[in-house]
Amino acid sequence: MKKIKYYIFFLLGAAMIASCDNELTEDVKMGIRVEQDGVSMQGDVVTVKAGTPVVFNFSGDPDNIMFYSGEPGAVYAHRQRTEVAPEDIESATLHFKIGTQYGKVYENTLEMFVSDQFEGLTKNDFKKDSVLVEQFAWNELVAKSELPDKPSIQKEYTVDVTKYLGKPMTLAIHYQAIDDTKNSMPRYNFSEMYIENVRKDGIVSKFMPSQYGFTAVNMMCNHNLKSQAGMKTNREYGTMTNNTAGIWNLVNAQNGGFYIAGGGKNTGNKNGWLVSDGLITTYCDPDQGTVIKNITQNVESYTHTYNKVGEYKATFIATRVNYKHDSRMMKELTIKVVE
C-alpha cells in the first residue's frame, strides 16, 4: 500500500512539473479591445475624437508590453531610424558657447571653419593631413572678430546650418598660440555644443560633439615640447584626458564640452586642429516606445490620448521571456482621429 502511495505522489509530481514546463514554453497571447462611449472599434480600426482618451483593454498573459502610439517620435517603423530626408527638416542650428581662461594675447589664436567640400582626413598620413587642413579653402563658421578676445569671458553662438542639410558638413577649429615668454597662453572652453534639428512634424533632435567624429591634427607633434612629453602614443592625431598644453581634450564631448589650453609661458608655441567627419546633418533620434507593462505588474488596460486629427498606426509589442522560452507578438491598430 505504501508503495502505491509513493507511486501516486510520483505521478502527481511529474504531472505538475510537466504542467509547469508547458506553461514556461507557451507562446505569448494578447488581445486588445476598446469598449467605451464615444469611441468605436471595428476590427482593427479605432475611431475617436481628438482629445478623447482611448482605453485599450488587454487580455492574455504577456509579461511585457511596449506601446508605440504612431504619433511623431513614437512610430514603430522608425525605432531604428537615425536620419530623415532633408525636406523633412524645418531648420538645423549649431549651438555652442566659448569661455576663456588665462593668457593675454588672443588675437588670431582661434579660428572656426565649415565646409561641405572638404575631402576628409586620411587619419593615417599626417604629412598629407597637416598640409590639407592648412591649405584648404575653408569658409568661416564664426568671424574672427566675433570670437572671444580676452580672458575670463564667455560668448554664446547660434549658427544656422540649414543650407548644409543632406551635404557632408565638416567643422574645423584651429588653435594657434605664440609663446611671447611673458604670459601664459589662452585656454578655450567649448560648452553646450550641439546641432539642433527641428523637423516639420515638430520633433526636435540634438546631435552632440561625441557623434561628430572629431579628430585632432597636432601640428607640433614632432617638436618634442616638454609640455607634451606625457603624450606617449598617437602624437599626430591623439587627444588627452588631462590638461596637456596644446592638445585637445574631448572627455566631455558627449555632453557638448571640450577644450584646449596653451599652457604657461616659456613652454613653446602651440598649434592644433580639431576636424570633424563629414556630418550628415539630417540626424534624428530613433523613435521611442512606452513601456506599459513589465513582469512585475498586472496591467489590464492602458489609456492614451490623441490630440491631433489624423490617422495613426498604434503598435503593441508583447513578450514572454524565461529561461526555457522567448516568445514575442505584435498587434497593430489603425487609429482614426476625427474632429
Model feature map: region roles:
Residues 92-100, 110, 167-177, 313-315:
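Extracellular beta-strand-rich recognition modules
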Residues 180-229:
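Exposed low-complexity, polar/acidic, P/S/T/G-rich flexible segments that act as propeptides
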Residues 1-5, 12-42, 327, 339:
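Bacterial Sec-dependent N-terminal signal peptides
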Residues 178-181, 319-325:
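Short, solvent-exposed loop/turn segments at the edges of extracellular beta-sandwich modules
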Residues 130-164:
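Extracellular carbohydrate recognition and processing domains
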Residues 48-50, 56-60, 67-69, 302, ...:
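Residue-level signature of extracellular beta-strand-rich folds
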Residues 300-308:
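Residue-level recognition of secondary-structure-to-loop junctions
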Residues 191-193, 325-337:
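C-terminal edge beta-strand
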